[in-house]
Design a protein with these regions (language model features):
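N-terminal binding-site loop/beta-alpha segment at the start of enzyme catalytic domains
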Residues: 1-83
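Structural preference for beta-strand elements that scaffold enzyme active sites
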Residues: 10, 17-21, 55-56, 82-86, ...
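A short acidic, helix-capping loop that chelates divalent metal ions and anchors anionic groups
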Residues: 28-32, 92-99, 215-216, 258-261
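Alpha-helix N-cap and loop-to-helix initiation/capping positions
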Residues: 34-41, 67, 71, 99-110, ...
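Short, acidic/polar
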Residues: 35-49, 101-119, 163-169
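Active-site groove signature of glycoside hydrolases
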Residues: 116-134
């Protein structure tokens, strides 16, 4: 029987989650805009994730926009103590489906209140600044998140798409619980950010963890997958889980079958030789 076998990490020191989570971007419509074609299926994916032992779900107000958060709030008991939900604010969507950074402190505060209502959570477990806005001083946006934490609106603060320098700047303002950057077995440009997270005991949430379409150049991945009777994507997830103790992969999908395949990857034990070859 498939179940989340990943070990645990304490987000912010007190929110214990299994390290393989679920990213809820794909439960929206095409292009991450609007309602999903099959709302019942989207709800089934969320419910099945929890049944499989996934207790960390990541979303954002820009997914839909608002659709992913609302479906989570309507489908799951978001106040249960054994389910941790992180969301993000600071990206807008336009009619062309562009992703537009917006870090104005007043906007972030209002966005948080809207996320809280959609998710039906008070406080929100983890609130992450989605992407630094070149038109807003980074420190101003982080101070806004610090105020949210001081006011009891959020339990922990995270960052996304940041550098080591920005992480350290933010740490001087408020305790940072997580960083969410692109990282996978095929793309390790942010290895320095991962190392900093390990140093500070900050959770590292690698987005695009499956590296779909980018695995052809990863030496040995198909051979290793065949050895474990697994898919190359399951090996990519297993590698992330074993590469560092602070990684919290959040593979997303709109399919229950794919969800179960992703969760099954948590039981794969790569050998030292296999890890070295993939690395």
């Amino acid at each position: 029987m498939v179940h989340n076998e990943s070990d645990t990490f304490d987000i912010g020191g007190d929110l214990t989650v299994r390290r393989l989570g679920f990213g809820a971007m794909r439960i929206t419509g095409e292009g991450i805009i609007g309602e999903p074609d099959d709302v019942a299926n989207a709800r089934a994916v969320l419910e099945r994730a929890v049944e499989l032992g996934v207790d960390f779900i990541d979303t954002a107000d820009s997914y839909g926009p608002g659709v992913s958060e609302r479906l989570i709030g309507e489908t799951l008991d978001t106040e249960r103590e054994d389910l941790i939900i992180g969301t993000k604010g600071g990206l807008l969507r336009n009619t062309d489906a562009d992703w537009l950074p917006h870090g104005d402190p007043d906007y972030l505060h209002n966005a948080l209140l809207c996320s809280r209502d959609r998710l039906r959570m008070d406080p929100i477990d983890l609130y992450q600044y989605h992407r630094p806005d070149p038109d807003t001083p980074f420190e101003d946006a982080v101070h806004a998140l610090a105020e949210m934490k001081d006011e009891g609106l959020v339990r922990h603060v995270g960052l996304s798409n940041v550098s080591v320098e920005q992480l350290e700047q933010a740490q001087d303002i408020v305790e940072i619980a997580t960083v969410q950057n692109q990282y996978n077995v095929a793309n390790r440009d942010d290895e320095d950010v991962l190392a900093a997270c390990e140093n500070y005991d900050v959770g590292f949430i690698p987005w695009f963890p499956l590296a779909a379409g980018e695995l052809d150049d990863v030496d040995g991945i198909d051979e290793i997958a065949e050895r474990h009777d697994a898919t190359r994507y399951q090996i990519a997830l297993a590698w992330l889980l074993q590469h560092s103790d602070v990684t919290l992969p959040i593979p997303g999908t709109s399919s229950v079958d794919h969800l179960e395949q992703n969760v099954a990857a948590s039981a794969i034990d790569l050998s030292e030789d296999e890890l070295a070859r993939l690395s």
